[in-house]
């Protein structure tokens, strides 16, 4: 029994030692990942500097997945004009930048109803629409499907630059812990609390951010998993079928 206890104790020490050595080996990556998250919360300037200085030129930032078409439009403008079509999305090969929706499932699109049309819903279902392309009306049909946007470094910089510096960041945040795998992939667990501008409702959520690095120590891949449903419920939303 005593020999077994000694053996287990030595095994535990070896595991702890291996974990410590691994963290020491990747300390620079862990520190950079934690600093990246902190900068993203702190200010627009801090976030912009962090990306410019530490994201690889060929690096990518992944958005949350959703079911839809796979296009981006500017809600600050009138109507619904396509700014960007996500590669390999249902919209790829059907929509083009500059296309403007005028009708969706038989309903004329207006500024008032454009957020309540049939773009979201069950995957696989077709949505019929009419767009204007180069001044000519064109009927289209697209089946909803999974979409995930991969932002390039240039797009990440543009997205940050187009943000509002005055309202940047949460009310409060905390970097809880960071860890690393044997392959050098870093995970950062963090928490934030924020207020929805339109309603004044306060919400909070935990988020895990995953980082991969290139040989030069630059961020090559970054993506988040968060408590999206929990946030929506705190803001008074509910899921309906």
Question: Positions of the model-derived regions?
Answer:
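Bacterial N-terminal signal peptides that target proteins for export
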Residues: 1-8
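Short alpha-helix capping/helix-loop boundary micro-motifs
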Residues: 84-90, 113
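PDZ/PDZ-like peptide-tail recognition elements
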Residues: 22-27, 34-84, 117-120, 142-143, ...
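PDZ-domain C-terminal substructure recognizer with occasional recognition of PDZ-binding tails
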Residues: 116-154, 158
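C-terminal motif of bacterial Sec signal peptides marking the signal peptidase cleavage site
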Residues: 16-18
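A short acidic/small-residue loop/turn micro-motif
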Residues: 109, 145-146, 225-230
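A beta-strand edge to alpha-helix "cap/lid" segment located at domain peripheries
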Residues: 21-27, 157-241
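Conserved PDZ fold ligand-binding element
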Residues: 91-111
């Amino acid at each position: 029994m005593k020999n077994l206890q000694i053996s287990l104790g030595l095994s535990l020490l070896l595991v702890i030692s291996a974990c410590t050595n691994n963290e020491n080996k990747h300390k620079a990556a862990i520190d950079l990942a934690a600093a990246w998250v902190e900068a993203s919360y702190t200010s627009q300037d801090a976030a912009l500097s962090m990306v410019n200085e530490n994201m690889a030129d060929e690096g990518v930032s992944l958005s949350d997945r959703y079911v839809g078409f796979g296009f981006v439009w500017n809600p600050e403008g009138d109507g619904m004009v396509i700014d960007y079509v996500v590669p390999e999305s249902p919209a790829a090969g059907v929509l083009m930048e500059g296309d403007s929706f005028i009708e969706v499932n038989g309903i004329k699109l207006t500024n008032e109803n454009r957020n309540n049309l049939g773009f979201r819903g069950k995957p696989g279902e077709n949505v019929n629409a009419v767009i204007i392309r180069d001044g000519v009306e064109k009927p289209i049909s697209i089946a909803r499907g999974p979409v995930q946007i991969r932002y390039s470094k240039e797009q990440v910089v543009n997205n940050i630059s187009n943000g509002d510096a005055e309202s940047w960041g949460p009310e409060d945040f905390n970097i809880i812990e960071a860890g690393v795998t044997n392959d050098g992939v870093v995970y950062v667990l963090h928490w934030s609390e924020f207020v929805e501008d339109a309603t004044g409702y306060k919400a909070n959520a935990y988020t895990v951010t995953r980082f991969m690095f290139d040989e030069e120590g630059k961020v090559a891949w970054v993506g988040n998993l968060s408590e999206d449903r929990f946030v929506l419920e705190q803001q008074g939303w509910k899921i309906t079928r």
